[in-house]
Design a protein with these regions (language model features):
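Periplasmic/extracellular electron-transfer cofactor-ligation site
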Residues: 68, 74-104, 129-137, 161-168
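Hydrophobic membrane-insertion alpha-helices, especially the h-region
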Residues: 22-35
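Membrane interfacial helix-start segments of signal peptides and signal-anchor transmembrane helices
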Residues: 12-25
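N-terminal Lys/Arg-rich, disordered targeting/topogenic segments
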Residues: 1-15
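Hydrophobic single-pass membrane-insertion segments
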Residues: 33-46
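Electrostatic cytochrome c docking/interface patches
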Residues: 46-76, 168
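Flexible coil segments in periplasmic/lumen-exposed cytochrome c-class electron-transfer proteins
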Residues: 136-181
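Electron-transfer interface patches adjacent to heme c in soluble/periplasmic c-type cytochromes
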Residues: 104-122, 141-151
């Protein structure tokens, strides 16, 4: 058998394996995309419609987010917040480390941050009044630019990006701070 014929046979026997590997790779990518899409869709309405109990205190189910308010909140967030907090809510790098002026960089509003650790009323107040001078907060207040309802709408958009655990915890804090157990 000639050298050229051996090379031709080797290529022919490798072709099915390459097709199989390529097909499996494509299947894996499609599977990952489907899982990601499902998780993203579930995050937007990540509620169980069950009462939330933490530390023995039960509050009503997490309120469902209104898709129209979430869309409006995204528009407002993009206009007023994204320049500092990031288009994907990611915040600034090293947001936990003080800057030379003593302030902190803008924190993320996604699940990696601490926004979901605070009740709604406190978050709206921070948005309205700006960063706390006691912490060298440099975030401007938006009370002149936005109504309280617009600030709450932005918060609805932010919440739409959290998972069910963050939503439930933040709702529990909000409800208990309002005396709703």
């Amino acid at each position: 058998m000639t050298s050229a014929k051996r090379k031709s046979l080797a290529r022919q026997s490798a072709a099915p394996r390459l097709w199989l590997a390529g097909g499996l790779g494509l299947f894996g990518l499609l599977l990952l995309a489907a899982v990601y899409a499902t998780q993203t869709a579930n995050t937007a309405q990540a509620t169980t419609n069950q009462p939330v109990t933490l530390n023995g205190i039960t509050v009503p189910p997490v309120p469902t987010l209104d898709p129209a308010r979430v869309a409006s909140g995204e528009t407002l967030y993009t206009q007023y917040c994204a320049a500092c907090h990031g288009a994907d809510l990611q915040g600034a790098p090293n947001w936990k480390q003080r800057l030379p002026n003593g302030s902190f960089p803008p924190p993320p509003h996604d699940p990696t941050g601490h926004t979901w650790h605070h009740p709604d009323d406190q978050l709206v107040a921070i948005t309205a009044l700006g960063g706390d001078p006691a912490y060298n907060g440099v975030m401007p207040g938006f009370a002149v630019s936005l109504t309280t309802d617009q600030m709450a709408t932005i918060l609805d958009f932010i919440k739409s990006r959290w998972g069910s655990q963050e939503r439930e915890y933040q709702w529990w804090i909000t409800a208990t701070s309002r005396g709703q157990p």
